[in-house]
Amino acid sequence: AFSSWG
């Protein structure tokens, strides 16, 4: 799984 916040 991959999550990103920016």
UniProtKB/Swiss-Prot annotation:
Q: Where in the cell is it found?
A: Secreted
Mind listing the UniProt keywords for this protein, alphabetically?
Answer: Amidation, Neuropeptide, Secreted
List of residues that carry Glycine amide: 6
Its GO CC terms are: extracellular region
Is Secreted there in the keyword field?
yes
> What is one Gene Ontology biological process annotated in the Swiss-Prot or TrEMBL record?
neuropeptide signaling pathway
Please give the function described in this protein's UniProt entry: Myotropic peptide. May be important in the stimulation of ion transport and inhibition of diuretic activity in Malpighian tubules.
Name of the protein: Locustakinin-1
Question: Species lineage, top-down?
Answer: Eukaryota, Metazoa, Ecdysozoa, Arthropoda, Hexapoda
